[in-house]
């Protein structure tokens, strides 16, 4: 394994200062060292791998050699959430949750996605500059609470907004990576407030013994209750879906708006495509834009694993108990795989072209591929098509940089001027997604 000398270290530091993100140093190290390197930080020296071959080892062929992680803020917050448990426990929770996120359920979710999007966008004044990072978060939060838990949180947004953001901040990378026991102030109260809110939803549903009959439907919350899970385990799954689900959708929507704003010609092409149809199954350019947004700025940009058994990456060995990061961000920008890898080129996904192997993994891969992958992509298609049909978006040309939080999001936000289009739009115009 090549060492990081002082010259390369200075280049990495300069890149960090220039890009205001650790992604800069990662790109520098990857370009000079290759697909495997170790970052020599104080008290923390994680190994980093990327590329299709490494992804195959970590996600498929040798996945039993890696475990999720030791105790940290993520495990503290999410408890036994499906995202972070291993083995049979993971498989059990996943099996319980998959029916509510299956593609067959998406048609009934479409109406909710549109109505929640309309709710938020109806608050915009014509010609107003809005932050599409914030607005996307509102939309995604409303959608996930309504579709998976049948909970309308519109009137509670002010109540849960800060607790949700503090929860995301709590699990975002920070000094705790270097020093696990570092004091962290200002989290206890908002995290408890969010817990109380979720436990309240569970309690309310348990009291409604005939909810399925009266509502004529079922949802994820009901599946978990019917499975006999404790309130604590149900809370863990709810919080996992709430935080991981809505935060990834927020990042995807915000980055897509940013990219369209930075590429007005493609923006107009997408608008023209959407104007020609009410069928959300027939928007190939929009689908390619979403895929390219996921390639350039994957919401979950890095996977964090702990080595349970020594692993070998092309002769480079990682001992047991070491920390391994597999970088989705670097994989998606590999110049050996992607032509014009740093550029926004939606056409690269045209004509049904599929990236080779595991060189494209915005939702992970293998048996633990993101349980909400299809839901998230359909949600993006519905929200974007509805808003682009209803509004013109003008980017304000401010500088944006990727921020490595719980997800990879555009900072300081995506400021866009919104103007209502004369084209009439309502939810009944859309055909259901099949």
Regions found by a protein language model. Give the residues of each.
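Cytochrome P450 fold signature focused on the C-terminal beta-domain
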Residues: 209-217, 271-284, 296-316, 331, ...
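Cytochrome P450 heme-thiolate "Cys pocket" and heme-binding signature region
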Residues: 95, 244, 302, 316, ...
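Cytochrome P450 catalytic-domain helical core, especially the substrate-recognition surface
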Residues: 2-27, 31, 37, 43-45, ...
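Conserved cytochrome P450 K-helix E-x-x-R motif and the immediately C-terminal K′/meander segment
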Residues: 13-34, 196, 278-314, 335
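Conserved cytochrome P450 catalytic core segment spanning the I/J/K helices
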Residues: 12-14, 75, 98, 102, ...
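Cytochrome P450 catalytic-core helices
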Residues: 248-267, 271-273, 374-389
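Cytochrome P450 proximal C-terminal region
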Residues: 30, 117, 134, 160-167, ...
């Amino acid at each position: 394994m090549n060492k990081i000398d002082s010259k390369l270290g200075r280049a990495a530091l300069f890149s960090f200062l220039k890009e205001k993100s650790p992604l800069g140093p990662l790109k520098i190290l990857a370009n000079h060292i290759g697909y495997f390197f170790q970052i020599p930080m104080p008290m923390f020296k994680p190994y980093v791998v990327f590329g299709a071959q490494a992804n195959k080892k970590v996600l498929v062929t040798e996945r039993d050699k890696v475990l999720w992680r030791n105790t940290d803020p993520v495990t503290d917050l999410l408890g036994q959430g499906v995202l972070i448990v291993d083995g049979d426990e993971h498989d059990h929770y996943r099996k319980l949750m998959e029916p509510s996120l299956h593609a067959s359920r998406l048609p009934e979710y479409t109406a909710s996605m549109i109505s929640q999007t309309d709710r938020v966008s109806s608050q915009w004044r014509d010609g107003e500059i809005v932050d599409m990072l914030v607005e996307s978060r509102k939309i995604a939060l409303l959608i996930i609470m309504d579709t998976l838990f049948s909970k309308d949180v519109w009137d509670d947004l002010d109540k849960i907004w800060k607790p949700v953001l503090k929860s995301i901040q709590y699990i975002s990378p920070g000094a705790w990576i270097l020093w696990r026991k570092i004091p962290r102030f200002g989290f206890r109260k908002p995290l408890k407030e969010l817990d109380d809110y979720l436990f309240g939803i569970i309690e309310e549903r348990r009291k409604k013994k005939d909810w399925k009959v009266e509502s004529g439907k079922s949802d994820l919350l009901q599946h978990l209750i019917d499975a006999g899970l404790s309130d604590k385990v149900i809370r863990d799954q709810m919080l996992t879906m709430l935080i991981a689900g809505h935060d990834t959708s927020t990042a995807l929507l915000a980055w897509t708006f940013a990219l369209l704003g930075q590429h007005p010609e493609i923006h107009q092409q997408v608008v023209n495509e959407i104007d020609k149809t009410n069928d959300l199954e027939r928007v190939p350019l929009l689908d390619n834009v979403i895929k390219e947004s996921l390639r350039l700025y994957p919401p979950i940009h890095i996977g964090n694993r702990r080595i349970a058994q020594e692993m070998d990456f092309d002769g480079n060995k990682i001992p047991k108990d070491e920390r391994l990061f597999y970088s989705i961000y670097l994989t998606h920008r590999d110049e050996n795989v992607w032509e014009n890898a740093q550029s926004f080129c939606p056409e690269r996904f045209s004509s049904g072209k599929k990236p080779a192997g595991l060189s494209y993994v915005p939702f992970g891969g293998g048996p633990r591929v993101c349980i909400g992958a299809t839901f998230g992509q359909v949600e993006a298609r519905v929200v974007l098509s509805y808003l682009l049909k209803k509004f013109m978006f003008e980017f304000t040309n401010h500088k944006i940089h990727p921020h490595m939080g719980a997800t990879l999001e555009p900072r300081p936000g995506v400021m866009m001027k919104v103007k209502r289009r004369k084209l009439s739009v309502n939810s009944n115009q859309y055909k259901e997604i099949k």
